[in-house]
Amino acid sequence: MINLVIDFNNIAMRAMYACIYMRESGVTNYDTPEECGILARKITTDIAFILHMFGPDRVIFVCDSKHPWREQLYESIPGMEYKGNRVKDEEKNWNNIFNTMNDLKDIYDKKGFITCEIEHAEADDLAALYKDALYNKRGENVVLVSSDRDWCQLIDFNTDKSNFCLVYNPIANNKGKKKIYLTEQCSEWLNAPEITNIFFNNYSKEKETIRTVSKDPKNEIEVLLPEQILTDKIVCGDDGDNVPGFYEFYQNGKKVRFTELRMKKLFEAAGITDLNGFKEKCIAGSINDYIAKLFKREINDMDSNERLMRQRRLVELNPVLFPVEETNTFASKYEPEMETTKGRITGVTSIKMEDILKDTDYVTEGYERKPRENAIFKNFDTKLLDKFVSNPLF
């Protein structure tokens, strides 16, 4: 069984900019219902493409909520704001954009998909909670869909049960490749020959699906070490989210902080081989001495154990670190859905944008695509236009 967990806001923002960059679409700032309609159809077309690619058994959309709980952690970090380095383009009609996104979430939910949103939670948190509920507790396969590299710390593989959790990045890199991130053990399992008897008892449909997706010339597998990704973020921080490093200071008006090279030197000097070793030094308080030697300055104002916990809560996608209100809401409202047919689309071979948005303001009876929309949908048309069939789910 494959569960597809989609970063809705990530997909929506990508589609929003794509519509503007394609000049033929005529989209400018989303001031009109027509432009918002184009956005809704673009988002849904992108999602339909991903569903067609993986043929999942269950589809889940995880959504960001306002005022994420991590903002509060910055009250003790002078001069910094969570994701404060992101500048909003004031020319765009954000009210219309977010209203369109909210409308789509309601439509997807009514069409039978799962749309998960919890107050003060980010999609990252929800992805981690679904991984725990589906992969860890139920032994099911999970494909996380997002271009957010933070999600890569969630990739996993169970060698005993041969179930996986991997990440698919739907945004192509500068070589035109879309990445499939997985662990080394998962890669070895995928490449191992299938040994079956005449009854195909050992045949894995999920394995064959990922193999097929990876063979697409537009996709590319990349093997990652999830612990290394997390270690880098805890020690070095994350400029993309405006996350500070474990230790940093200003010298001659310039910020000095950990880089990967400095982290490597610190670990070598302290005899640290992995993240657990770093945690042990932080809890014992001895890491400060090694950091002081590395940066050639005294450190008297940092509790390394408290700093470790701050960094972990900022970047680590571990439900144990989330607010209890968030995990309780998930456990009571969303986890029970795993026992129902909610979000299940088993047996559906393909889904068309027109199917999902049928009988809404975005696809009314007699809908025909307008010429101005052809440019933003053309990449999908060549592969999907003749392959979609009527979907019995809708």
Where are these regions (language model features)?
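A short amphipathic alpha-helix within small helical-bundle interaction modules
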Residues: 7, 148, 275-279
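Noncatalytic, basic helical substrate-engagement surface that gates or grips nucleic-acid strands
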Residues: 2-145, 151-184, 316, 322-334, ...
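Non-catalytic nucleic-acid-binding/docking modules located in mid-to-C-terminal regions
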Residues: 49-63, 78-92, 113-114, 132, ...
